[in-house]
């Protein structure tokens, strides 16, 4: 049993992925546009071209998608396998084989994993 599955079984973690899957079923272009607008507002910018964007605990992948559409190189990670699947499904739907968006399994509590991420311009969590 994986660490994630063991922690779910012991009641130490909540499975967010199923909720994100339902959210993606109702995702509209308006919600994607709102995510883009909110990122620009929060960061005080018009776009993210040339920026490296890290989505910590990517969940549905909505803000990874928003950053990608704003021109960033995106790196998304989550500990929950179902959340990773949701983020990957969103990437597949909107960007297919574009290497500007990487998705991986990882934990914000794993110092070794974090050390391998390299230089980042924007961290979103």
Features from the language model and the residues they span:
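A conserved beta-strand element that flanks and buttresses the S-adenosyl-L-methionine
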Residues: 124
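Conserved N-terminal segment of class I S-adenosyl-L-methionine
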Residues: 1-54, 60-118
